[in-house]
């Protein structure tokens, strides 16, 4: 199965040159996404106004929105969306960053939600970043047809009235 790298136009270059996502068949894998590029600090949208650090939304909200909008843009470029996510990993630098992230995540990720894991770790590679997210989604247009099991004559169907 061929794979295709997804690069968002205007995305900040990183020393590692990792694509925003990779599509392989019906699957799309978003790279770990933070509030700024590896080694480059936080994106202006996350930092906020330098003279008014407390103006507007809290940094955690801005950071989560930037991350999920970036993943959504990469998925859209690959023919899917966060709504088709099946696996979601979150890495946080402290418990205090979980609630702001989840507040924004609820706006992007609706039920049925993907399988999910949250990991706490002391720091991330983008200076000042407090959350990193990677996600796997399926392209519904390329998803395999559902498997229908012919169970009508299976003994368990009769025994348990399945």
Language-model segment annotations:
Residues 1-69, 73-87, 92-162:
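N-terminal presequence-like segments and the immediate start of the first folded domain
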